[in-house]
């Protein structure tokens, strides 16, 4: 009997728990026998075919599969030889589809993909066994499904005894989750806490995305890792899926404990029961007593103390509930080791000081969200063929829910069995207001907030995505101080109604919509609730701004947020409009469509004698404020943020006013502003933006009191001539860019980190410049009066970026040592000698007409990664470049003739991506071009190992590229043709696992010499076909040129573009295929030139080439290696390079040359490449080159002779004969 099934040593049990499907010839006497023993020792019934009479039909075994609860499908090398094994697998698949069986696949020295896709010898045996069998299709479906279930892999490195224990553990976990007899909701998650698991694909239990959640939670509960008692908190926003997760956990884990209890809906139960009922309920579950009394619990407590228990408490909402259960929890914690307690809550503060660790339940990813939504939207019609028609709409609803499980469930349920018109209508309604069923979920948490917390929550919704410090400052006031404001933010964060990310306060979209709904409801009630108005139709009535409507009182208006981009017509504002708004805190007239707020027309007509008695206002934003000053009755006592961009304001207010809370002021582009006297008492001011205030001439001396000012922007203040002497100790960023009349810079702070002096009229830096020991960025671009950089700049030890671009009179850069300087921009200067700075990474010398050569010592700049030499028109030669250089841009170096040989040092561990650009170097000599191509070849060879380093070969961008004037494909390319399309017949096994990448070449020509472009990009569409498969074309980058900084340029000459890429999709696809099969393959390549995003018709590819790049296999003899296009040697430092294609002798060995085509060369006995024959012409065009198998073998034998491999030569001779 070919089948392989196993059972217990006892008499046949009434029902077998486990059936093992395996190939007896492979595993019966080894692995499976040990597995059976281990299962029996754990009291698990196992079926074995020894109990059936030999010769009985297979139907008996299939019946045993139906009777079992779990099947272990063990796939081994010869599994597919047995039709019995495969028929059993077909039955297993049917039972798992019905939900009556749990399958755990085990891959014994096989990859799951090999089983799933029937690859290699495993697949060959299947095809041989199933040849002509009509059941072949169903068997393939079984192979496709079962291996997709997460299973256990046993490879060559595995310790089999450990894997046996892992399987036993998985079986026990699965058995605890299987419901009683007769239930059809079989659990399909089997592997529990191990590294493996199962899933059925038909998730009837609605746990989409829960597998990973459960696994993560189980890791925190791990009984093997944590021996003592452990309490875990499960937290997350309302409706995120905590209850579903805990029920799954309880169902899976309860069988591991002698006592276990799940108390759910604690929030609801606490509202209807006394708190002392909670410990009674818990003890009742744990002690199995019907009605235990807390006063007489000594015996239950002692039982609790002696047993390992599992306690799950769901939806805890108040500290009092925890306190009521504290005594029991303490007994559990002091009791027997191994107990576990899980507490789920939407308020993380309740778990502080109680739990050992916390698991935060995150939103679902897009895939699981879509599955969950579809499950509920088509719950009665999962096979609905029209589901595809609803896909686009589904994406919209899933995006709306943002991974929130309950929202997905609610929305899907509301759309179930509804028409597409209803779906469209529902989406439009959701844009106006959220679903009431979603609102009700958040309403429970909102109702439990204090009044202050409710106001803070609704206020934060108006300022979401703002800095946390900013939000807390707005909330802080005379009635709610900074401590209370921070407390409110923390409380809301703990309750998951808001969250902080990267220092910003964020809010889930559903909660944001909920907050808006709460405010809208307030207007429909008695008007006693404070309101925030943001809909323009609620603010503007009949062309007049008027919020006094219905029963709502002006005194209850807390905020007005008017987006002027939504206002079509001009509106008027009554002079007395704000008189009764004594509680108005936030007033914003802004434009959401123009971030810079510069193109908005002033749509609000304001009377001259506007009254603005807003004592409580915290935030005042008024785009294009039309008055010369704020009204006299305006009181900024609580003002925190003042923003009046593009205003007509000349000064803020008349006289001095107390501004103890003012921290942010933005008056940018208020071109009439001439006085800052109103800020004389703003001692807490942190940011001041005066960009574009072109009339402002001076700063008041009183501003020296601003000890907290950290940011000062004076960009474009063209009338500003100087700053007063002051010491702003907190100032970190100072911007004077474009202050064209600013001549002398005084040191107003020793703590400046970023200093912008670009476009000013300064001629020298201050004498005490060395005090700026925290200065990181110094920008002096376009300082045309600047003639020298003082040597004391070298004392700025923190300086990382120095920008001196377009300082036309700067001729000398001092010899200084700035150990941390990374970026040095000297483009457009008159410097004649390049500075030697060992730490510099980015060096720009472009547009320099003085430099004729670079110092030889540049090769020692080991940190240099980017060298910009564009338009250095006097540069005639370049020395050897350093090994880590990633980008060299020598575009437009019209005098450049020679390059160093070698062009750059290449390290044996080379892995840097790099680009070398020599476009429009019209005088580049032929020797220089040959060195560039030789360097490209060596670089391609070394980078072949990069695909193993970079994400398993999934690097899609070009790993190396270069371009230079020329009209020929380099000789080391194995395949080339005239035109933009290349078709190649590749050798068998070309795609074996040593394939590292492809080298591509394109020669382009400009059809219109007068055409100017800002970017050229050459790409190649690579397509491979063989007997079995056809792959979707994959586009590989070859190389590109970009004119940075704007502008366009001509590319008049023909240019050669060379690129090396790992071509990951093609290689990956072939590696997953069967590389052992000997199939001829055809490849087609098409090269295109694009100017940005679209094809550029003014440029064409008139020659192209291809070489496949392979890594050398030291375990194979070189006769086999000659099948490769380009070989990668063991050490490239051992070879002597050349471009003539000859075999160079290095240390007693010969290195295989890279040749254009074997048939083009004739070889002598000494291995040297003889003179090439002329290329044969067809119809006036070069004939496309093909490899000759005969010449290929000749070359192989000659190389073997060189290396003394006589046996290999004899083998090839016999084979050819």
UniProtKB/Swiss-Prot annotation:
It is found in: Nucleus. Residues 1162-1195 are annotated as: Disordered. Induction: Up-regulated by AvrRps4 in an EDS1-dependent manner. One of its GO terms (cellular component) is nucleus. Changing residue 195 to D: Loss of resistance. Loss of resistance. Changing residue 950 to H: Loss of resistance. Loss of resistance. One of its GO terms (biological process) is defense response. Keywords: Hydrolase, Leucine-rich repeat, NAD, Nucleus, Plant defense, Repeat. Its main location: nucleus. The active site is at 88. InterPro entries: Apaf_helical, C-JID, Disease_R_plants, Leu-rich_rpt_3, LRR_dom_sf, NB-ARC, P-loop_NTPase, TIR_dom. It holds the Pfam family LRR_3. The TIR domain is a signaling domain involved in cell death induction. Interacts with EDS1. PANTHER family: DISEASE RESISTANCE PROTEIN RPS4-RELATED, LEUCINE-RICH REPEAT-CONTAINING PROTEIN. Only two amino-acid changes (N195D and Y950H) are linked to a change from a resistant strain (cv. Columbia or cv. Landsberg erecta) to a susceptible one (cv. RLD). This is Disease resistance protein RPS4.
């Amino acid at each position: 009997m070919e089948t392989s099934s196993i059972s217990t040593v006892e008499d046949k049990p009434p029902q077998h728990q486990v059936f093992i499907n395996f190939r007896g010839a492979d595993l019966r006497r080894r692995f499976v026998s040990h597995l059976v023993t281990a299962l029996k020792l754990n009291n698990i019934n196992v079926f074995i075919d020894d109990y059936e009479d030999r010769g009985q039909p297979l139907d008996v075994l299939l019946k045993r599969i139906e009777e079992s609860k779990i099947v272990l499908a063990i796939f081994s090398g010869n599994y597919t030889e047995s039709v019995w094994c495969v028929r059993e697998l077909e039955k297993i698949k049917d039972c798992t589809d019905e939900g009556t069986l749990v399958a755990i696949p085990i891959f014994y020295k096989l990859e799951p993909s090999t089983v799933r896709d029937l690859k290699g010898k495993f697949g060959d045996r299947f095809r041989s066994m199933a040849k002509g069998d009509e059941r072949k299709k169903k068997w393939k479906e079984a192979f496709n499904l079962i291996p997709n279930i997460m299973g256990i892999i046993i490879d060559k490195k595995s310790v089999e005894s450990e894997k046996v224990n892992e399987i036993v553990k998985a079986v026990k976990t699965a058995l605890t989750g299987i419901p009683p007899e007769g239930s059809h909701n079989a659990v399909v998650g089997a592997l529990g806490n191990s590294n493996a698991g199962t899933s059925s694909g038909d998730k009837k239990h609605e746990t989409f995305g829960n597998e990973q959640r459960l696994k993560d939670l189980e890791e925190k509960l791990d009984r093997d890792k944590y021996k003592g008692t452990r309490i875990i908190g499960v937290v997350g926003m309302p409706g995120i899926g905590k209850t579903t997760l805990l029920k799954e956990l309880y169902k899976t884990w309860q069988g591991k404990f002698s006592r276990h209890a799940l108390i759910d809906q604690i929030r609801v139960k606490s509202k209807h029961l006394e708190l002392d009922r909670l410990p009674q309920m818990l003890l009742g579950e744990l002690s199995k007593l019907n009605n235990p009394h807390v006063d007489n619990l000594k015996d239950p407590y002692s039982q609790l103390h002696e047993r390992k228990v599992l306690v799950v408490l769901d939806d805890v909402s108040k500290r009092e509930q925890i306190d009521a259960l504290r005594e029991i929890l303490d007994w559990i914690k002091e009791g027997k080791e191994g107990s576990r307690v899980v507490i789920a809550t939407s308020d993380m503060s309740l778990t502080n000081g109680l739990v050992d660790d916390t698991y935060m339940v995150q939103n679902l990813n897009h895939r699981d969200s879509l599955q969950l939504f579809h499950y509920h939207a088509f719950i009665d019609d999962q096979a609905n063929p029209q589901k595809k028609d609803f896909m686009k709409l589904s994406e919209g609803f899933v995006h709306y829910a943002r991974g929130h499980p309950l929202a997905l469930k609610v929305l899907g349920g509301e759309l179930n069995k509804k028409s597409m018109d209803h779906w469209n209508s529902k989406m439009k309604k959701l844009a106006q207001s959220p679903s009431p069923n979603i609102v009700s979920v958040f309403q429970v948490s909102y109702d439990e907030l204090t009044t202050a917390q409710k106001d803070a929550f609704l206020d934060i919704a108006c300022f979401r995505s703002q800095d946390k410090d900013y939000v807390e400052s707005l909330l802080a006031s005379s009635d709610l101080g900074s401590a209370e404001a921070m407390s409110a933010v923390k409380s809301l964060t703990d309750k998951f109604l808001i969250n902080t990310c990267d220092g910003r306060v964020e809010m889930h979209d559903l909660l944001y919509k909920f907050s808006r709904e709460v405010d809208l409801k307030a207007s429909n009630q008695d008007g006693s609730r404070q309101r925030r108005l943001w809909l323009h139709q609620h603010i503007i009535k009949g062309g007049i701004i008027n919020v006094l409507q219905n029963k709502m009182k002006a005194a209850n208006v807390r905020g007005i947020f008017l987006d002027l981009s939504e206002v079509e017509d001009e509106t008027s504002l009554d002079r007395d409009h704000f008189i009764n708004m004594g509680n108005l805190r936030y007033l914003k007239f802004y434009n959401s469509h123009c971030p810079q707020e510069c193109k908005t027309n002033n749509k609000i007509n304001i009377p001259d004698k506007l009254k603005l008695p807003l004592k409580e206002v915290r935030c005042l934003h008024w785009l294009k404020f039309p008055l010369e000053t704020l009204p006299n009755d305006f009181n900024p006592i609580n003002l925190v943020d003042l923003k009046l961009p593009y205003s007509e304001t000349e000064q803020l207010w008349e006289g001095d006013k107390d501004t103890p809370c003012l921290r942010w002021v933005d008056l940018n582009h208020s071109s009439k502003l001439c006085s800052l006297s109103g800020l004389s008492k703003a001692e807490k001011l942190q940011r001041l933006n005066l960009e574009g205030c072109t009339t402002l001439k001076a700063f008041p001396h009183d501003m020296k009191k601003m000890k907290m000012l950290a940011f000062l922007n004076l960009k474009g203040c063209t009338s500003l001539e100087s700053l007063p002497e002051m010491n702003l100790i907190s100032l970190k960023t100072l911007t004077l860019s474009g202050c064209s009349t600013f001549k002398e810079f005084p040191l107003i702070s020793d703590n400046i980190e970023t200093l912008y002096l670009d476009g000013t009229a300064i001629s020298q830096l201050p004498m005490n410049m060395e005090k700026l020991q925290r200065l990181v960025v110094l920008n002096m671009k376009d300082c045309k009066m600047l003639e020298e950089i003082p040597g004391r700049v070298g004392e700025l030890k923190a300086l990382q970026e120095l920008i001196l671009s377009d300082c036309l009179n700067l001729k000398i850069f001092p010899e200084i040592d700035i150990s941390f300087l990374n970026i040095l921009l000297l483009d457009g200067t008159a410097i004649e000698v390049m500075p030697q700075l060992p730490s510099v990474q980015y060096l720009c010398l472009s547009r320099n007409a003085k430099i004729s050569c670079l110092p030889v010592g540049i090769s020692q700049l080991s940190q240099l990664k980017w060298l910009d030499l564009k338009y250095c028109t006097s540069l005639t030669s370049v020395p050897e470049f350093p090994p880590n250089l990633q980008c060299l841009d020598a575009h437009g170096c019209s005098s450049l003739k020679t390059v160093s040989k070698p062009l750059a040092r290449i390290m044996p561990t080379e892995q840097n991506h790099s680009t070398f650009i020599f476009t429009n170097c019209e005088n580049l000599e032929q020797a220089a071009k040959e060195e560039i191509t030789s360097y490209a070849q060596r670089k391609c060879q070394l980078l072949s190992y990069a695909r193993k380093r970079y994400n398993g070969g999934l690097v899609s961008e070009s790993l190396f590229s270069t371009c230079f004037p020329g009209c020929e494909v380099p000789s080391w390319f194995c395949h080339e043709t005239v035109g933009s399309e290349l078709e190649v017949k590749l050798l068998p096994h070309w795609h074996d696992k040593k394939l590292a990448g492809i080298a591509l070449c394109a020669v382009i020509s400009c059809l219109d010499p007068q055409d100017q472009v800002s970017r050229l990009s050459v790409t190649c569409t690579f397509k491979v076909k063989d007997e079995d498969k056809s792959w979707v074309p994959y586009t590989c980058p070859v190389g590109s040129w970009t004119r940075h900084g704007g502008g366009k340029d001509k590319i008049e000459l023909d240019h050669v573009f060379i690129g090396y890429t790992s071509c990951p999709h093609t290689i990956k696809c072939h590696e997953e295929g069967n590389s052992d099969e000997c199939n001829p393959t055809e490849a087609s390549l098409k090269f295109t030139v694009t100017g940005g995003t679209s094809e550029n018709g003014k440029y064409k590819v008139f020659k192209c080439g291809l070489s496949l790049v392979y890594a050398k296999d030291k375990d194979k003899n070189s006769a086999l290696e000659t099948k490769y296009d380009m070989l990668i040697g063991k050490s490239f430092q051992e070879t002597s390079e050349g471009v003539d294609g000859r075999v160079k002798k290095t240390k007693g060995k010969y290195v295989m040359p890279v040749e254009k085509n074997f048939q083009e060369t004739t070889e002598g006995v000494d291995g040297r490449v003889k003179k090439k024959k002329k290329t044969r012409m067809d119809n006036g065009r070069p004939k496309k080159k093909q490899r000759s198998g005969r010449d290929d073998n000749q070359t192989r034998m000659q190389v073997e002779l060189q290396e003394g491999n006589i046996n290999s030569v004899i083998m090839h001779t016999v084979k050819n004969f």
